[in-house]
Design a protein with these regions (language model features):
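Internal nucleotide-binding/catalytic subdomain
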Residues: 150-152, 171-173, 186-192
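Alpha-helical structural motif
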Residues: 130-134, 138, 147, 151, ...
């Protein structure tokens, strides 16, 4: 099987790969998932390393027999803020105006983070601090989950943070370290039957 995960947002992009029309297995784009295809115990290839792959790989890695991720350009993978909210936090959100205030704080945080990626005079220091923080965090995660040094180097983006969509995930890198998961960084020349 080959699952193409190289699309962009709501308009799926299927790359033109030599030999794709000769592939005899099931092949579909993640934006048009074919739920009739059984992948349990099968060899599956995922093309692309963006947000779709970061969701698909952890979701199916424990289900398939062997998974190969055909990785393209390195991506900025940042921690996803997944956590359970305690009873006090849930209760506070029921108070009038609190939900709106929390939403305003969240928007403000993301607006500040966005500004940090811009090169406005006077904000270069903030930008450097934010980028250094995320670079250090990604390097730590790569060191933790990716044993192969060459792959670690390939997975560290060589472009500025914020140039491409960030990938928030706590499951992607651990999934790539599973025994049944391989990462191929050699590039795809052709698909064979």
């Amino acid at each position: 099987f080959v699952i193409d995960a190289s699309g962009v947002l709501a308009n799926p992009h299927t790359p033109k790969i030599t030999g794709a029309d000769t592939f005899t297995g099931a092949m579909f784009h993640s934006g048009h998932w074919d739920h009739s295809v059984a992948i349990d115990g099968k060899r599956v290839g995922v093309i692309g390393s963006g947000c779709s792959a970061a969701q698909i790989v952890p979701a199916i890695a424990g289900q398939v027999g062997r998974l190969t991720l055909f990785m393209g350009k390195a991506q900025w993978i940042i921690p996803r803020s997944d956590r359970l909210h305690g009873p006090l936090e849930r209760w506070v959100r029921t108070l009038p105006g609190i939900r709106h205030a929390i939403r305003l704080l969240v928007f403000t945080f993301y607006d500040i983070r966005f500004v940090a990626f811009r090169r406005y005079p006077g904000l270069a220091g903030i930008s450097r601090v934010v980028k250094a923080h995320y670079r250090k965090g990604l390097q730590k995660d790569l060191d933790t989950y990716v044993a192969d040094e060459k792959l670690r180097r390939h997975m560290m983006p060589d472009y500025e943070m914020g140039c491409r969509r960030l990938i928030p995930s706590n499951a992607y890198l651990p999934a790539l370290s599973r025994e049944n998961v391989d990462v191929d960084i050699s590039g795809i020349e052709a698909i064979t039957p």
